[in-house]
From Swiss-Prot:
Coiled coil: none annotated. It comes from the Archaea. InterPro entries: Ribosomal_eL31 (IPR000054), Ribosomal_eL31_CS (IPR020052), Ribosomal_eL31_dom_sf (IPR023621). One of its GO terms (cellular component) is cytosolic large ribosomal subunit. GO terms for molecular function: structural constituent of ribosome. NCBIfam families: PRK01192.1-1. Keywords: Ribonucleoprotein, Ribosomal protein. This is Large ribosomal subunit protein eL31. PROSITE patterns: RIBOSOMAL_L31E. PANTHER family: 60S RIBOSOMAL PROTEIN L31. Belongs to the eukaryotic ribosomal protein eL31 family.
Length: 91
């Protein structure tokens, strides 16, 4: 049986994705995903591999194709008791 993982910490961030404009156009959305992972890992003191992006956030990053991700995203970050971190798009 799988038991619910307990949320230890919840925070909201506005992540600026301005740096994606410094990367070639055909790599921007993928770079934005990595940028979000590194940002959250740095702020919550976990490894980037432990950061899981939600489906709505991923769809928002890729909505205008690979070349034009948004300039900034509003996210809700939840750290679970097993050390993983969930990142969801703020509604």
């Amino acid at each position: 049986m799988s038991e619910e993982k307990k949320v230890v910490l919840t925070r909201e961030y506005v992540i600026n994705l301005r740096r994606t404009r410094e990367v070639s156009r055909t790599k921007r959305a993928k770079y934005a995903v990595g940028l979000i992972r590194r940002f959250v890992a740095r702020h919550l003191k976990v490894e980037p591999k432990a950061v899981k992006l939600g489906q709505a956030l991923n769809e928002a990053l890729w909505a205008r194709s690979i070349e034009k991700p948004p300039r900034r995203v509003h996210v809700v970050v939840e750290k679970l008791d097993d050390g993983t971190v969930r990142v969801e798009l703020k509604q």
